[in-house]
Amino acid sequence: MLDVLIRGAGPVGCALALALRNSGLRVALLEASSAPPAFRPLALSYASRLILERLGVWSGLNVSPIERILVSQAASFGRTRLDAADAGVPALGYVTDYAALLAQLRAQVTTTTEVSEASCIVHAEGAPQDTEGKRYAQDAIVGLLQAEPPSTATAFERFTPEGPLALLPLAGRYALIWSMRPERAARLVATSEAEFLRELNAVAGGAIGRGTTIEKRAVQPLALKVRGARVEGNEVYIGNAAQTLHPVAGQGLNLGLRDAWDLAHVLGRAPAAAAPATLARFAAQRRLDAGATIRMTDFLAAGFAGDNALLRAARGAALTALDIFPAPRRFFARRMIFGAAALP
């Protein structure tokens, strides 16, 4: 019998398998589907870089660094700038494509389609289907944008009444993640390139210069789904199987990688992988980081949307305060990078 069966060979499941490879535990990684992933931009935090370096996959990954993030809101006052130097890191994050990261991880693991008995079952197969959660009044359009001038190492996060617009530097272009009303998303994903760029450039407000072409447009529905219990008997839930977040601030995968790293740390040091005390220790260890990240993401997604004078003033005041006072700005940047708990 296996010690650990990991269900789901996405980035989080693969990361856990790699983190356990020298633990002495008998581990299997179960892949249910081999469908090629669609274009999906990822913003990996510096903390995720540290994890991937320890797993031996970082050096082969093509990434574009984010050295600064310019944050603003549309049609109102309030802006701030987050810099890597202020946060004490070489980069705030790194942009890559989901498929590229998955290929690097899959190259170093062995997967199976055979279900085996195991003392501990880890669910890393994606968003929980049996959790209702909260559906945001937003869908996200993702795509690959060419702009003039080309992207450098600056990312843009622009809050609009319908939802946030993120533009992330990726190999001289921008990865686009644009949240908006579902009916508008359905229209814009199907409209002409010229009309799409016209509306995008109007919302971006000249922050990136001018978008000139857009490729790989797709729509993603947005919801917050949080599993009630991270541990149930000998079963553990990590990554999107434990919590599915809004893409604002790019926290979802980074939180999932921290889940995997902490679980590997706990399982690798335990005399029995599925012992109740072992799994309870993992759940307690993840409570602060996961809870704080979920609340922050939900606040940014829902609390920073809406279009009335009071909300605009509150958003503007919050951004202005971050811009004026370096201590809270550094705290916010490091919280986005490392979560609410440092790496073990």
Predicted regions and their residues:
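Glycine-rich FAD cofactor-binding loop and adjacent beta-loop-alpha segment at the N-terminus
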Residues: 3-5, 9-67
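Active-site flanking residues adjacent to catalytic metal/cofactor-binding acidic residues
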Residues: 7, 30, 122-124, 239-240, ...
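Hydrophobic anchor at the start of a short beta-strand
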Residues: 25-27, 121, 174
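Conserved N-terminal helical subregion
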Residues: 50-54, 58-144, 148, 152, ...
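Conserved FAD-binding catalytic core of PHBH/FMO-like flavoproteins
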Residues: 123-219
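FAD/FMN-dependent oxidoreductases across multiple families
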Residues: 187-274
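C-terminal helical "tail/cap" subdomain of flavin- and related membrane-associated enzymes
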Residues: 265-344
